[in-house]
Amino acid sequence: MLTGSTSAPPVRSLVLSPRDSSELLSPTGPLTPASTKGAGTSALSSKIASVLSTSYADTEFREALFLLDERGLQNVAENRRKLRLDLQKEVIDSNGEIIHEFGKVAEQLKRIGYTIGKLNESYNDMRTQIHAAHASTASTLGEASQLMTQKRQIESKQKLLSTFKTHFILTQDEVDALTLTSEPVDDLFFTVLAKAKKISRDCEVLLGFEDQTLGLGIMEQVTRNLNHGFQKLYRWIQREFKSLNLENPQIGSAIRRALRVLAERPTLFQNCLDFFAEAREHVLSEAFYTALTGSSAAGLEDPSVKPIELVAHDPLRYVGDMLAWSHSAAVGEREALEVLFISEGDEIAKGIQVGREAEVWRLVAEDGEEMNIFDPVVALNQLVDRDMSGAVRILRQRVEQVIQTNEETILAFKLANLINFYKSTFSRLVGPASILVEAMGTLETEALRQFRSLARDHVATLQTEFQHTPPDLRPPDFLTDALEQLSAIMKTYETSLSSSGDDPEAEFASIMAEAFDPFMAGCINMANHATPPSKSIFLINCFVAARTTLSGFTFVRKYAADIQTKIEEEKARLVIAQYELFRAESGLDSLIEALDGLDIRKKDDVGKVATLEEVQPEALRQSSQKLDDFLPSALIDATEKLKNLQDSKLASSVIEEAAERFCVDFEHVEEMLLSADELEEQRRVEEDGDEEHSQSFRALFPRTSSEIRVLLS
């Protein structure tokens, strides 16, 4: 096998036959007589050709040459002769070593074969024993496998049962903590209650199975425990309410948590609120009575309290102090209840909504029927209102007594206005549909009724004064008093919340109907018995006084505008009266009237002037003379006529307007007379050319309109 190694091929290629090698390596060739020149040449040529034909690029040949080169042989005849032998000897030695080594390998293989035989015997023996053991333990292993399977199933069932019991069953300790009144309402109670509620919800899954016995049983047990738990919580909250101090700024978190949980039972929650409201109503009633009298209903005095009945020095202060106490108590009650019921967000509202949806009557309600959504703010307002109801009853009795015993008109209105202010305040605090607001509305109505009654009684007592105007035509005393009273009322109303409402003018109209209109009607009735212009002067004096009173208030602008209109109407009457007086006293009345219908632009009308009786020389002289007598004292006489008019500016305006109208009429008279003179002059010239004529109208009536305006200005 080893002769095929990498060194073998070059060795084989160099091994030549003895004949060939001797011939090749011999420098002279064979020396036999039989060799001829031709044969020797042929053999040598063949050898040379063979050598030359050998490719030096052949790998095996090159390796053979490389091996020869490594041996360091000299190219001598001795070495050439021994080369084959040495090579063969080396091959034989190598083969011998290989055979020796293979002998060792064969010996080792024999030992391995012996060992393998022993192993096969042991394996067969063990296999026989195993088959025998397996045959004897097969039934036992089957039973063990079944037992292991059963064990796994039982363990799975145990785990499921344990999980089921943990999730759906309350332990006895948990049931005791939930239902026994001897156990406290603490974190454990609320934890167990939450677990019971979760069990109740999850029982719906069990009820979905075909066999509902387990689900119904657990549901019944949990429901019973839940009911006992909520009853325990309900009674605990009632006990806490009895000792609860709302004035304490830090109300316990336990009671707030209990209320949030109890809200899931709306009926129990409402019963708690009713109980709480009754207790707070009694407490606040006692507190209000103590604030009024300084002692409780049982007669126990409180030295720290200043009794309102003793401190208040007038009815308005008395009512104001009672209303202020009620407002302060309502605000304090609301703030405390906000901490108690709303400080934790809308959890109570959510709980009540959940409880309502779970109630039986909710489930059987008609399809179209919807239950109102719980509003915590509205519920809080209602609770505050109920807490204050006892104090409100006492307040209402006391205020009604004050209103009924009051005999002052202004005080009655101030009381009504004060009550209206607190009505608006309570409406924002506890809502418009509350006992507080209803009581304030009733008291306000009662105060306004008393105000109207007193105002009407006052007007009735003044009926005898509504007969004749005062000699100096000034506003009567009853009007002055009424306007002072009205001014006080309007100032009170202006500071109230009502004046900033949507339509304060309409709201105040009812007050004006009682405190203003009757007195103005009385003045008008008095003026009807007077003669012009005294009637107008008296009415203007009354109207101006009323306008002065009303002008400072925006919510009576309509009344002020009506008064101003009436002043203008009476002023117009005074202007007419003064204008007629100017015409009569100046002596020009008949002349103005005669020329009134004539137009200066019409020649025919101008021609008629000379034919009028009023412009005849004698009549015209008398009119001119009377006018001259009138003008020096005209303004003084006119001012004297209006001396009772208290508004001097208005009197001057009346005289100016009357004088202006008189001057306009005089200008018309002057223009007509001048036109008549011109027309007469033209006629004379046309007839005879003689410019001399009788005395002209201007000569008979020399006054000019400019002079009149100066004298009457």
From Swiss-Prot:
Map out region (Disordered) in residue numbers: 1-40
Record bears the keyword Membrane: yes
Please give the positions of the paired cysteines in each disulfide bond: none
Question: What keywords are annotated for this sequence in UniProt?
Answer: Golgi apparatus, Membrane, Protein transport, Transport
Can you quote a single GO CC term? Answer: Golgi membrane
Q: Where in the cell is it found?
A: Golgi apparatus membrane
How does the protein's chain sit in the membrane according to the entry? Peripheral membrane protein
**Top-level taxonomic group:** Eukaryota
Keyword Protein transport in record: yes
Annotated GO biological process: intra-Golgi vesicle-mediated transport; protein transport
Q: Kindly give the InterPro entries that the UniProt entry links to this protein.
A: COG6 (IPR010490), COG6_C (IPR048369), COG6_N (IPR048368)
**Which N-terminal residues, if any, form the signal peptide?**
none
Coiled-coil stretches are none
PANTHER family according to UniProt: COMPONENT OF OLIGOMERIC GOLGI COMPLEX 6, CONSERVED OLIGOMERIC GOLGI COMPLEX SUBUNIT 6
Functional description taken from the UniProt entry: Acts as a component of the peripheral membrane COG complex that is involved in intra-Golgi protein trafficking. COG is located at the cis-Golgi, and regulates tethering of retrograde intra-Golgi vesicles and possibly a number of other membrane trafficking events.
The similarity comment for this entry is: Belongs to the COG6 family.
Protein known as: Conserved oligomeric Golgi complex subunit 6
From which organism does this entry originate?
A: Neurospora crassa (strain ATCC 24698 / 74-OR23-1A / CBS 708.71 / DSM 1257 / FGSC 987)
**Gene of origin?**
cog-6
